[in-house]
């Protein structure tokens, strides 16, 4: 092998070695940045989605508070000994507009109900005797608390906001707003694709919402129902193949989880690598070209001297010598 070729190989190898190290380090850093950016994007999306749902629940919470302190509602709750005609007149002229009109302005409202000890006869769906509250699915597990309590039933597709009204430490009435499940969680449904999924749970870990577009993600065994798993169990399965983030509601005790397939995140990293490959190949060709050029320059005089010596060995007495 000629000296020039050896020198070319030496120059190319010594140039490629640091370039390879630099390329690997750069790719590693970019991969880390991409993964971090993906996680930040997920958190940002989840925060915006949570704010969208919170803004809805805040509206209905404000409506519930308004109705709770409405003088007309207070009058209906306090007046217990009135004749049926007067009661019917108050119900139709006062209570019905208060409890029915908001439904025409908010398409997520299914109904607004007042359960009161003063109501003796049920009036349509708006005014109901207090003892009939126990027949409602959401009455189970209610706390003795004047703050708004949120209940979700995924099977019925219903979300309710309940407020207890007390008089002298005795339950006097209950106001309840029933909301459409799909409309309340629509902001979360809108961000879901075939690469991610979302979960909403309460502070006890009960799953209130669970949807995923990942077909290969199996969250339940064949003998398990969707409602039988807690949020922690679901997350332990999700963590095996996905990256997830969480945020808490500011309006109630809901916790929002948003997860994305690790393959989808790795796909972003692979796209960066594919973008880097042409640059790496171009750098390789440049190094090869420079190696050939420099080795030719460095060995030109040596090759001329070798040629002259070869001529002398063959009996030539004419030698060309040039000096720089």
Cite the ranges covered by each PLM segment.
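Sensory-module boundary signal marking interfaces of small helical input modules
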Residues: 4, 184-187, 265
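Solvent-exposed, extracytoplasmic
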Residues: 91-102, 174-215
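Extracytoplasmic/periplasmic sensory segments of membrane signal-transduction proteins
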Residues: 40-140
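Cytoplasm-proximal transmembrane signaling helix
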Residues: 257, 262-317, 321-322
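Soluble sensory domains of the PAS superfamily and closely related sensory modules
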Residues: 135-147, 221-238
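Short, hydrophobic beta-strand elements of compact beta-sandwich sensory domains
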Residues: 164, 171-181, 240-276
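Extreme N-terminal signal-anchor transmembrane helix of membrane signaling/transducer proteins, especially
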Residues: 1-36, 40
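Extracytoplasmic/periplasmic ligand-binding sensor regions of membrane-associated signaling proteins
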Residues: 103-179, 186-187, 191
């Amino acid at each position: 092998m000629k000296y020039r070729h050896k020198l070319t190989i030496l120059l190319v190898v010594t140039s490629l070695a640091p370039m390879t190290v630099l390329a690997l380090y750069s790719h590693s850093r970019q991969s880390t940045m991409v993964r971090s950016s993906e996680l930040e994007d997920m958190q940002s999306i989840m925060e915006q989605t949570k704010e969208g749902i919170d803004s809805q629940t805040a509206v209905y919470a404000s409506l519930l508070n308004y109705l709770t302190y409405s003088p007309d509602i207070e009058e209906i709750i306090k007046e217990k000994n009135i004749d049926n005609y007067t009661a019917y007149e108050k119900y139709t002229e006062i209570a019905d507009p208060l409890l029915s009109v908001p439904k025409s302005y908010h398409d997520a409202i299914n109904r607004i109900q007042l359960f009161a000890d003063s109501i003796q006869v049920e009036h349509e769906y708006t005014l109901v005797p207090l003892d009939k509250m126990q027949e409602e699915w959401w009455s189970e597990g209610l706390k003795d608390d004047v703050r708004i309590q949120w209940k979700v039933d995924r099977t019925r597709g219903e979300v309710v906001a309940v407020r207890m009204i007390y008089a002298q430490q005795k339950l006097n009435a209950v106001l309840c707003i029933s909301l459409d499940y799909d409309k309340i969680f629509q902001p979360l449904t809108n961000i879901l694709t075939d690469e991610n999924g979302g979960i909403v749970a309460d502070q006890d870990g009960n799953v209130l919402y669970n949807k995923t577009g990942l077909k290969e993600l199996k969250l339940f065994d064949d003998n398990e129902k969707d409602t039988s798993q807690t949020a922690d169990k679901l997350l332990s399965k999700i963590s095996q193949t996905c990256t997830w983030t969480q945020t808490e509601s500011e309006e109630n005790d809901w916790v929002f989880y948003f997860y994305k397939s690790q393959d989808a995140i790795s796909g972003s990293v692979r796209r960066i690598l594919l973008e880097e490959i042409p640059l790496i190949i171009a750098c390789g060709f440049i190094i090869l070209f420079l190696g050939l050029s420099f080795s030719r320059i460095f060995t030109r005089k040596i090759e001329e001297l070798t040629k002259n010596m070869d001529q002398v060995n063959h009996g030539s007495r004419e030698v060309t010598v040039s000096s720089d």
